[in-house]
Amino acid sequence: MTEVLWPAVPNGTDTAFLADPGSPWGNSTVTSTAAVASPFKCALTKTGFQFYYLPAVYILVFIIGFLGNSVAIWMFVFHMKPWSGISVYMFNLALADFLYVLTLPALIFYYFNKTDWIFGDAMCKLQRFIFHVNLYGSILFLTCISAHRYSGVVYPLKSLGRLKKKNAVYISVLVWLIVVVGISPILFYSGTGIRKNKTITCYDTTSDEYLRSYFIYSMCTTVAMFCVPLVLILGCYGLIVRALIYKDLDNSPLRRKSIYLVIIVLTVFAVSYIPFHVMKTMNLRARLDFQTPEMCAFNDRVYATYQVTRGLASLNSCVDPILYFLAGDTFRRRLSRATRKASRRSEANLQSKSEDMTLNILSEFKQNGDTSL
């Protein structure tokens, strides 16, 4: 099953171009339009696969991400105090992931509803804004975690003052400010648009009207909040691996946690972040510059691959809790202790309720004068 769609048109624009028989929407019943027509524009062909892949991935991410990050936040708040510097970064990473997974039910419904958005323009903007805040917030907090571990492994004595919790708190506040300010243009670029068949789309990028300026903005954020952090992370990990090879850390917990950190973070980048940014850039270029009849089939393949990477980009919310468990400071040990304590408390409560029930039964028998017991 395939669905051929003309590009959606943004809400609230002039209808003059829409009435033009030469426009893609010329004979449609749509009541709004994009700004300026191009000589030729490829019609987007969506396959049935795209309607089911993303909601399936989002359901998986919501279930695993909600449970994993809920447990992580519970652990950091109630069982990990006093926090170390790396715990501060991991808590903020868990918080960013948790806020993102809370937005997924609306997206899941959107795709099961044949990509017809019913929640309004403001909710669409908020949805896309939170996705990008999570995406780049996660990247920057992973960079902070990597730099923190690098300082602890390569310069264990010199970095004692720099690795204090207070400094980590200041850096975390700065990261949130950078991300929120840097991503705030998404609130302008994203939004809803009306398709030819009167269904409403929620742009994951922007409408054709603002596409060229959005491409420039997207490249700036990609360089500043993806490429630069990736270079820093690779540099940190290269020096960490070198230090682990030349230092006598064969059986130390620091060596084990550092190795886990390198493996998990590089896996997240290789699976989630790198494919997403590559295909997002290619998709934007295709929409801008590859609008010829010969390129339409290629554009469809680029768009389909981009949709796959959108699902992969959300998987980091599932993987990050594994990072806390394997690479965090005493997280696994304290989680085990907390679950044992909760289990003992549950057993004690159950035993107490059982004893209370027995006493109540005996009391009722005595009040009724029954001495058969």
Swiss-Prot record:
Glycans are attached at N11, N27, N113, N197. The gene is P2RY1. One of its GO terms (molecular function) is ATP binding. It is a multi-pass membrane protein. The chain crosses the membrane at residues 52-74, 88-109, 126-147, 167-188, 215-237, 261-284, 304-325. Residues 75-87, 148-166, 238-260, 326-373 are cytoplasmic. CDD domains: 7tmA_P2Y1. This is P2Y purinoceptor 1. One of its GO terms (cellular component) is cilium. ADP binds at K46, Y203, D204, T205, N283, L284, R285, A286, R287, Y303, A304, T305, Y306, R310. Pfam families: 7tm_1. The keyword Transmembrane helix applies. Residues 1-51, 110-125, 189-214, 285-303 are extracellular. It is found in: Cell membrane. Belongs to the G-protein coupled receptor 1 family. GO terms for biological process: cellular response to purine-containing compound; establishment of localization in cell; monoatomic ion transport; phospholipase C-activating G protein-coupled receptor signaling pathway; platelet activation; positive regulation of monoatomic ion transport; regulation of cell shape; relaxation of muscle.
